[in-house]
A protein has these predicted regions:
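Non-catalytic helical/linker scaffolds that mediate oligomerization, partner binding
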Residues: 1-129
């Protein structure tokens, strides 16, 4: 089955994606997503966006797709927990440390390898899976 996954850098683009048939949207909030130049979402806006999407049968993927330092890992984990409490359907991850941590703290939330994860071999893909 083919799925249309669209970016949502702010509420206007989220509404446009949903109204034009997106099956799912990916969006970030906070500092740990590769779309930092986009408007992105405050915590309150993110929660509203998740509700808006779910009421319309659209899934929401959180982008946590940047490389992290050891000092940033705890903050990124907090963002992950907060977004999962808001009802995100999946997480797009780049950093291997966050991938490992996410498997521990939100084991039931699907994780997706970001295109920035730099997986080039079958072995790397198997390790990420």
């Amino acid at each position: 089955m083919m799925e249309l996954l669209s970016p949502a850098g702010g509420f206007d683009s989220l509404i446009a994606a949903v109204q034009t048939g997106a099956d799912a949207v990916y969006m970030g909030f906070g500092a740990f997503n590769a779309r930092r130049s986009a408007k992105n979402f405050t915590d309150e806006e993110f929660a509203s966006a998740v509700s808006y999407c779910h009421l319309r049968g659209v899934r929401v993927f959180l982008t946590l797709n940047t490389l992290l330092t050891d000092r940033e890992l705890a903050q990124a984990a907090d963002a992950l927990k907060k977004a999962c409490a808001m009802g995100v359907d999946a997480i797009l991850v780049q950093d291997w440390g966050l991938l490992t941590l996410a498997r521990e703290i939100v084991p039931d939330v699907p994780l997706h390898a970001s295109t920035q994860m730099s997986l080039f071999t079958l072995g790397g893909a198997n390790e990420a899976a």
